[in-house]
Amino acid sequence: MIRRGRLLTVAAAVGAVVALSATASAAAPQDAEGFGGRHSVREHLSSYHEHPLALSTTGNGQFRATLNERTGEITWQLSYADLSGAITQAHIHFGHAFQAGGISAFLCTNAGNGPVGTQTCPAAPATISGTLRAADVIGPAAQGIAAGEFAEFAKAFRAGVTYANVHTAAFPAGEIRAQLDR
């Protein structure tokens, strides 16, 4: 009888845990793929991550970002140092680790080619930060993300198929890069 009582107690406890898990899952807002809430990355930028050719420079950096799906924003911070030339611009691109993808959003530019309100890139060493919203997403349309399509950009960010890239006068295609997948 005592054994049967313990079995019933364990069964009730397991049932309560399952019920609470189901309730918590139902309470969190989710999109069609089942995502909801926040997603964060923290990456080290290096010239070795550049594509199609890895580079060997002293340039380095850090990129941190948090996607808040409830507010439709990505807050970010980019630090860079020891670049081999003057920084010209920095972006988030849409592409795999060994792919050169199109620009999704500007982080900064000194080339005057960013959307209105894009901050200028200070000389290295520097740390800049900002918030990306739908109005900051510029594409890439050729890869299926239209300008202003924050939900598609957010899906790519969550899936780890975006990367941060810092471009310099010495390396216009990019000097340091990090895949945003951790």
Per-range role (PLM):
Residues 2-9, 17-90, 94-182:
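Metal-centered catalytic cores of metalloenzymes
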